[in-house]
């Protein structure tokens, strides 16, 4: 059991590292939309569930 847990944590850290690298690439592009999106988000948040909205956002960019 201990061995399984160790391997799992290792794979997770590797995935996280890869994800971070990808994020930095699009950071400059996303910064532009952050301000405009925040204002809109407050009104829309009530109507849509959080999970559904986040999925939609991801597809757009």
From Swiss-Prot:
Q: Which InterPro entries match?
A: Protamine_P1 (IPR000221)
Q: Which PROSITE patterns match?
A: PROTAMINE_P1
Q: Where in the cell is it found?
A: Nucleus; Chromosome
- Tell me the GO molecular function terms: DNA binding
Per UniProt, which keywords does this protein have? Chromosome, Developmental protein, Differentiation, DNA condensation, DNA-binding, Nucleosome core, Nucleus, Spermatogenesis
Instruction: Give the residue ranges for region: Disordered.
Output: 1-61
Q: In which tissues is it expressed?
A: Testis.
Instruction: For this entry, list what GO says about its biological process.
Output: chromosome condensation; sperm DNA condensation
Q: Name one GO cellular component term.
A: nucleus
Which family is this protein grouped under?
Belongs to the protamine P1 family.
> Function of this protein?
Protamines substitute for histones in the chromatin of sperm during the haploid phase of spermatogenesis. They compact sperm DNA into a highly condensed, stable and inactive complex.
Name this polypeptide is given: Sperm protamine P1
- High-level lineage: Eukaryota, Metazoa, Chordata, Craniata, Vertebrata
């Amino acid at each position: 059991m201990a061995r399984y847990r160790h391997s799992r944590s290792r794979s997770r850290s590797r995935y996280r590292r890869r994800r971070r690298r990808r994020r930095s690439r699009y950071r400059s592009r996303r910064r532009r939309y952050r301000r405009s999106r925040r204002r809109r988000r407050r009104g829309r948040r009530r109507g849509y569930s959080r999970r559904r909205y986040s999925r939609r956002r991801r597809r757009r960019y």
